[in-house]
């Protein structure tokens, strides 16, 4: 059995919602919900929050979770890589789970872990597009090869359907990632790519440098908390049994 760690990067100073990980959601910090749901995923050995903020670390520990203090990091992936180095035993598979996903479904975590077979070094998820999402730049689209590896991720409507209408091949990216521990180190050492900069999509760095990303299917739609309004929606969904 492979040793699997889910590492959740969290920072205090989000520009649109400072202090977001500590925001109250149904009587506990938002970040605690992410930790609790990640622990329900089968095949996970360790769940830890990676942060450079003592307040977040304390809140996680008070809620019964594990927190790893890191230095300042350029990206969440860099923070995850640093935290993975501090775990003992060192994980073989590292899942990078965003800290603003309090409604994450354990099955989505299981799906991305399950994609790490047959020499796959990096994996992520995709779901069917809802009506009207193809044109929305906030929804990242992905197209894949027959093998299931990503051809490209874009905020643009891909693929374009010459016959008109939305292509049944279009899928929305869900931003959960799994890496082998070795490839996580490789990835974070790569120079940022030009397309990565144009699209503001970090995963394009792997494709630009010639590495594959396996894309697995999920029914989880993703629900990140970016604003106080999003938090209110999450409260309503939790109250409804989400």
Swiss-Prot record:
InterPro entries: Cytidylyl_trans, KdsB, Nucleotide-diphossugar_trans. Keywords: Cytoplasm, Lipopolysaccharide biosynthesis, Nucleotidyltransferase, Transferase. Its EC number is 2.7.7.38. One of its GO terms (biological process) is lipopolysaccharide biosynthetic process. SUPFAM superfamilies: Nucleotide-diphospho-sugar transferases. CDD domains: CMP-KDO-Synthetase. GO terms for molecular function: 3-deoxy-manno-octulosonate cytidylyltransferase activity. Its main location: cytoplasm. Pathway: Nucleotide-sugar biosynthesis; CMP-3-deoxy-D-manno-octulosonate biosynthesis; CMP-3-deoxy-D-manno-octulosonate from 3-deoxy-D-manno-octulosonate and CTP: step 1/1; Bacterial outer membrane biogenesis; lipopolysaccharide biosynthesis. Signal peptide: none annotated. Transmembrane segments: none annotated. It is an enzyme of class 2 (transferase). It catalyses: 3-deoxy-alpha-D-manno-oct-2-ulosonate + CTP = CMP-3-deoxy-beta-D-manno-octulosonate + diphosphate. Pfam families: CTP_transf_3 (PF02348). It is found in: Cytoplasm. One of its GO terms (cellular component) is cytosol. Belongs to the KdsB family. PANTHER family: 3-DEOXY-MANNO-OCTULOSONATE CYTIDYLYLTRANSFERASE, 3-DEOXY-MANNO-OCTULOSONATE CYTIDYLYLTRANSFERASE, MITOCHONDRIAL. Activates KDO (a required 8-carbon sugar) for incorporation into bacterial lipopolysaccharide in Gram-negative bacteria. This is 3-deoxy-manno-octulosonate cytidylyltransferase. It comes from Anaeromyxobacter sp. (strain K).
């Amino acid at each position: 059995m492979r040793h699997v760690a889910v590492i959740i990067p969290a920072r205090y100073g989000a520009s649109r919602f400072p202090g977001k990980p500590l925001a109250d959601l149904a009587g506990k910090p938002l970040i605690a919900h992410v930790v609790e749901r990640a622990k329900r995923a089968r095949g996970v050995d360790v769940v830890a929050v990676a942060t450079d903020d003592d307040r977040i670390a304390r809140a996680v520990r008070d809620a019964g979770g594990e927190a790893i203090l890191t230095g300042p990091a350029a990206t969440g992936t860099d923070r995850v890589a640093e935290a993975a180095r501090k775990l003992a035993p060192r994980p073989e598979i590292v899942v990078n789970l965003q800290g603003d996903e309090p409604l994450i479904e354990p099955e989505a975590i299981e799906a991305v872990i399950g994609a790490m077979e047959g020499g796959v070094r990096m994996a992520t998820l995709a779901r069917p597009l809802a009506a009207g999402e193809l044109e929305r730049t906030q929804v990242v689209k992905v197209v894949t090869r027959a093998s299931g590896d990503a051809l490209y991720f874009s905020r643009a409507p891909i693929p374009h359907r010459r016959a008109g209408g939305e292509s049944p091949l279009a899928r929305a990216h869900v931003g959960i990632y799994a890496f082998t521990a070795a490839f996580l180190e490789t990835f974070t050492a790569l120079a940022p790519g030009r397309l990565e900069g144009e699209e503001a999509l970090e995963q394009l760095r792997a494709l630009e440098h010639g590495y594959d990303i396996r894309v697995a299917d999920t029914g989880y739609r993703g629900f990140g908390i970016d604003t106080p309004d999003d938090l209110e929606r999450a409260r309503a969904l939790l109250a409804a049994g989400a």
